[in-house]
Amino acid sequence: YESVWPFGWLGLLADTPPVNPELIYAHHERGFVLCSQRSLTRSRYYLQVPLSEKVEEWSDERFWTELKRRLPDELTNKLVTGHSLEKSIAPLRSYVVEPMQYGRLFLLGDAAHIVPPTGAKGLNLAASDVNYLWRILREYYHHGRIDLLASYSRLALDRVWKGERFSWFMTRLLHDFPQQSEFDRKMQAADRRYYLESRAGLTTIAENYVGLPMERVA
């Protein structure tokens, strides 16, 4: 199962202090923005760009100028710019293989599923796969539970699809889409207000972002 998103992320890494100590997700009519801290002196920034863009066409100056356009004034005034250490464009896609096992061949991580990075679920889901398979193999080798080997795909996929759903939801919530109607934009804005202003909405995002509970294996 695959869905390719109609945009990518242009990322820039720089030895500049982060604009904010906490991660920033921002929606703007020109496209999504993400600001992240790698250390107290190193920052990573991302801009939503069309898939047709070439990284060679983005000078550092152009990147910083566009980032400032998309950030609110209180952040723009604190932004420290500098020479980039690395720039790249990553296409976004959602992808899941079913089943995640063939006999005694088990698929884990990117071999079985890919998520857009908006929900920060890629590494979490890979660790979840490892955790499920480790517990199953422990029961098999220590207690002879051969019956549990067939349960890996079901257990892993249940969590994978929930992670895919959250990444899909966050991507749709925060990005600008080609040929988006004004009605679509109004609905998207209403969604953002709900999830920012409602305790239930905030709880839903927090629960999924931190990570849903693992199922029992045996």
Where is each model-derived feature located?
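Conserved FAD-binding catalytic core of PHBH/FMO-like flavoproteins
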Residues: Y1-L92, V97
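Short, cationic motifs built from Arg/Lys/His that form the positively charged side of catalytic pockets
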Residues: E56, R104, A156-L157
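Short FAD-binding loop at a beta-strand-to-alpha-helix junction that anchors the flavin cofactor
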Residues: P99-P117
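C-terminal structured domain segments across diverse proteins
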Residues: L105-D110, N124-L125, L133
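A conserved FAD-binding loop/helix module that cradles the flavin
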Residues: P117-A127
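C-terminal helical "tail/cap" subdomain of flavin- and related membrane-associated enzymes
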Residues: T118-A120, R135-A218
